[in-house]
Amino acid sequence: MFAAIQPGLAEGAQYPGSLPPGVCQPDLQPDNNSNFVESAKDANKNWHGVPGKVDPILIRSSSESPSDNQVFQATRLPEAGVRSPPEGAEIPGAEPEKLSGASSVCSPLEDIGYASSSLSIDSFSSSPEPVCDTPRGPSPLDPLLPSVAQAVQQLQAQERYKEQEKEKHHAHLVMYRRLALLQWIRALQHQLVDQQARLQESFDTILDNRKELIRCLQQREAPCRHQDQG
């Protein structure tokens, strides 16, 4: 938000040789290479400042090209004096480059336990808990399946046997009915023969009786004729 520009580094600086009003003099401390750099801590040992993009003009020196160590220090010097404003005092018209750089870069200097914390609401809501479902392997065959298949086969065999028995019973029934019909026809034939025999006997008896009657009548007429002639 409010960045301090180092004197002599930026060309055409507004305050050459001194810091602008409202910016404290940074505390210079030697690093591992005995180079004095600004401290990244404040009086309360709080890390501040976000390493962002640095203009190449700030890295370039007027006398000679800096070494890699000096370039690395120069890239960190402008951001060391940046002070974060109090909560609620953010500038709505901040540069999009700084905002995007601050939101995308994450270093140990700015990570105080909240940026990568798994207890934050955003990380908890955006990354749901993985479902601890162990992948199940191919389940073994149920021991009841062979018995069920065997029972089904037995039922099918019983059904076929019943159908065959029904067909046999129907054939036997038809045959028995035919035999009964033949026996009834034969019985009728025997009865018819008996009736014919009885009728023949009756007819013969009638004929015999008729002959006897005729003979008796002839015998009676013969004496009467003798008497008339005498």
Swiss-Prot record:
Residues 1-103 are annotated as: Disordered. Residues 85-94 have a biased composition (Low complexity). InterPro entries: DUF4653 (IPR027812). Residues 60-73 have a biased composition (Polar residues). Belongs to the UPF0500 family. PANTHER family: UPF0500 PROTEIN C1ORF216. This is UPF0500 protein C1orf216 homolog. It comes from Mus musculus.
